[in-house]
Regions:
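An N-terminal boundary/leader segment
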Residues: 3-80, 293, 309, 316-318, ...
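Glycine-rich, small-residue loops and helix-cap segments
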Residues: 46, 57, 101, 141, ...
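Long amphipathic alpha-helix in the N-terminal Rossmann-like dinucleotide-binding domain
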Residues: 77-87, 143-144, 153
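Generic hydrophobic alpha-helical segments
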Residues: 39-43, 83-86, 186, 388, ...
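Immediate post-signal peptide segment of exported/extracytoplasmic ligand-binding proteins
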Residues: 86-102, 250, 280-290
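Short, conserved phosphate/pyrophosphate- and ester-handling motifs at nucleotide-, phospho-/glycolipid
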Residues: 46, 107, 247
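Short glycine/serine-rich loop/turn segments
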Residues: 99-241, 292-294, 341-342, 427-445
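Structural helix-boundary/capping segments
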Residues: 13, 63, 141, 192-198, ...
Length: 510
């Protein structure tokens, strides 16, 4: 097992004097709501101050961040200035936005103008983008207050947030265990109460899997509904951005704010922003919920039991359970680990020490390239670059990458047949609950299997989301994954809201 790095997170904070101040005043703002919807409603109505909301969340960060390490950077000064602007808008009678005063954490692979964006990699340590990602712009326009950049597996390559150059992010539910990945910092930030909302990216399950392991809601929307402009690319045909939240309504609220066409992203779907909140109370009566009969096996019994409980809850709410087949689903993991590394090997070629980021000086240009990339990239990133380069090489392209693309099409065809019979599909999000830190670090194949249920929807470009649905082994959260056809977010959120209501009725937390 490799040594665990517990980074001194103060290195990444813009301000050092706020920690003691916030710890001292940690209980001052105990009346702050926990959901983004309630916070925004209170700020807009004038019953809450955005600056008070922010200070309450900074106090929570000060109290627990040292144990969790959700953040690479907490942008205290910028957040306080943004919160003050929201309060000024309210006082002046201006519309502060639908997310007025809501603290939001951003995964550290999204460009933030003048604020470090590292992708948790030494090769980009200290790099400050000259522009904001479209999602960052839209959140700011909606009145959200960005509070920092969250930790991730380097360049979003991993399933545990152990592959960060800046240390491990620990699970707030049990700090001896992983938070999932690659958006583990974003999931942990919401689970720990550092922010009611965070934004992650999802290439093969990197929002949904950590959401399941941390017991929060995580959404990967349809490919192209949320702009990727300003997202540092891992695998461009698979990457998508989406929210984490403590409840379903908050994720709907955020998706409405960040979705919609963006001319800066050539893959952006030319459509209006998603409209989701109005469907949350509609129920699932008459909906067809698909059970995949040939789904890959191997999920823990506790996880399977919670999936069956979810089917029972939806049936009790009026849905019909139907069996569907996905014969190509068992090949999704193999296809993904050819396609994604192939795209990564191309996308990461730009980090060469010439234009930006780390440069290791050497005797000639080729030696500088090699030394820079050797020093700047971590082991998992190197592994995937080599795998992708091999798969794209002239002698092996047809045997590996070409076949993977054919499998990708077969999986899309399987989904099309399944959605002819069912409105949504239900699967586990992760085959296991959160595992101990270091348990799978030396076994990449075991780590890759954590995404066996999330990868297929990325290959097809469809929406999917994870909702917490009880607990499994060791009292740890279990997530259920809802899959829907392209642009099927409304029916997906109907089902999510129904599952959430059934958990509340049974006495479980949202």
């Amino acid at each position: 097992m490799r040594p665990l790095l517990k980074t001194d997170v103060s290195v990444f904070r813009r301000s050092l004097d706020w920690t003691a101040e916030m710890t001292t005043n940690a209980n001052i703002h105990s009346n702050i709501p926990t959901t983004a919807f309630a916070i925004a409603d209170g700020v807009r109505s004038g019953t809450l101050k955005a600056v008070d909301v922010l200070e309450a969340h900074l106090a929570q960060i000060a109290a627990r961040e040292g144990d969790i390490h959700a953040f690479n950077l907490v942008t205290v000064d910028e957040a306080r200035a943004a919160a003050a602007r929201v309060d000024a808008d309210v006082a002046a009678g201006r519309d502060p936005g639908v997310l007025a005063g809501v603290p939001i954490a951003l995964k550290d692979n999204m460009c933030t103008r003048g604020i470090p964006t590292t992708c948790s990699s030494k090769i980009l340590e200290g790099w400050r983008p000259p522009y904001d990602a479209t999602v960052v712009q839209r959140l700011a326009a909606a009145g959200a207050v960005a509070i920092g950049k969250t930790n991730l597996d380097e360049f979003a390559m991993g399933s545990s947030t152990e592959n960060s150059a800046f240390g491990v992010t620990f699970n707030p539910r049990d700090i001896s265990r992983v938070s999932g990945g690659s958006s583990g910092g974003s999931a942990a930030a919401v689970a720990a109460g550092f922010s009611p909302i965070s934004i992650g990216s999802d290439t093969g399950g990197s929002i949904r899997q950590p959401a399941a392991l941390c017991g929060v809601v995580g959404v990967k929307p349809t490919y192209g509904t949320v702009s990727r402009y300003g997202l540092v690319a891992y695998a461009s045909s698979l990457d998508q951005m989406g929210p984490f939240s403590t409840d379903v309504r908050d994720s709907a609220l955020v998706l409405e704010a960040i979705s919609g066409h963006d001319p800066m992203d050539s893959t952006s779907i030319p459509q209006a922003p998603l409209s989701l909140q109005h469907v949350l109370s509609q129920g699932v009566e008459g909906l067809r919920v698909g059970r995949i009969t040939d789904m890959p096996s191997g999920a823990d019994p506790d996880v399977t039991a919670r999936l069956e409980a979810a089917f029972d809850a939806l049936k009790a709410a009026g849905a019909t359970i139907v069996d569907v087949e996905m014969p190509s689903m068992k090949y999704a993991l193999t296809a993904y680990y050819l396609i994604a590394p192939a795209e990564a090997s191309s996308n990461l070629a730009r980090y060469d020490g010439v234009r930006y980021g780390l440069r290791v000086n050497a005797t000639d240009t080729n030696a500088m390239y090699s030394a820079t990339r050797t020093a700047g990239f971590g082991e998992e990133v190197k592994r995937r670059i080599m795998l992708g380069t091999y798969a794209l090489s002239a002698g092996y392209y047809d045997a590996y990458y070409g076949k993977a693309l054919k499998v990708r099409r077969l999986i899309s065809d399987d989904f099309a047949r399944a959605y002819a019979k069912a409105d949504v599909l239900l699967t586990p999000t992760s085959p296991i609950v959160a595992f101990p830190v270091g348990e799978k670090s030396d076994d990449p194949l075991a780590m890759y299997l954590c995404d066996i249920y999330t990868i297929p929807t990325n290959l097809a470009g469809h929406p999917a989301m994870s909702v917490p649905f009880g607990t499994g082994a060791h009292g740890l959260p279990v997530g259920v994954q809802i899959l829907a056809p392209t642009l099927g977010e409304q029916v997906m959120f109907k089902v999510a809201a129904s599952l959430e209501r059934s958990m509340i009725a049974a006495g479980g937390a949202k």
